[in-house]
Amino acid sequence: LVYKDEQGNPDYRLYRKAVADLDVSAGKLLNILPKDLELFHTGSLALVPEMLDVLIPVITELKSRGVKISIDVNARKGVEVNHQKYIEAIAKFVACADIVKVSDEDLLITNLYGDPNTHVQSMLNSMENGMVVLTLGEAGSHFISPKFNIQQDIYKAKSYGDTVGAGDTFFSAMIAQLLRDDALYQEADQEKLGYALKFGSLAAAINVAKVGCH
């Protein structure tokens, strides 16, 4: 269930036990995925302890085929009764990814306080040739790896609807642009990397201008 707080930002009440989208095995998931898959994306409500035995084998197999792995942390309070186990599960998924999106709010929900860049560096240290997209709300976003730190200011929407789906819109648009430019790796042309970050920011601004996720 989705609500809005006094600032118009979305708030959620989650019911995540015995739900259909978690009723899948690693084998079943691998069987239905396209053979020509370039990227596998997951995150948020799927990053729970009970999904480790499903998704980690899937991710491991896909990486062996050269498929890129994308994770959107998109942490939510109340997803898992044991919050510490939820945090630990997220860390295990992040370590498997080629690219991760995390927000300043995600860091707070997962008990990571202080300088966001410090926590991003810890994520990068756990990843193999990984990249992290850090979003900071009104302060813009960063695309970070051991080789670069590209900053992007937000684009102000001419009108304001709400922020529902803004992060999803931002990251999906950015990932799509990286794939179009064959730039989903650290050594890619930084102009292409920066353009993808800009493209995602523009898409988010369009979403924020309307009510609901677009």
Ranges and model annotations:
Residues 18-27, 79-85, 185:
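Short gly/ser/thr-rich secondary-structure transition/capping motifs
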Residues 1-44:
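Conserved N-terminal subdomain of the carbohydrate kinase-like
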Residues 29-30, 90, 120, 160:
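Acidic, amphipathic alpha-helical patches
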Residues 60, 114-214:
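Conserved phosphate-binding/catalytic region of the ribokinase-like
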Residues 10-11, 20, 69, 75-76, ...:
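Glycine-rich, flexible loop/turn motifs
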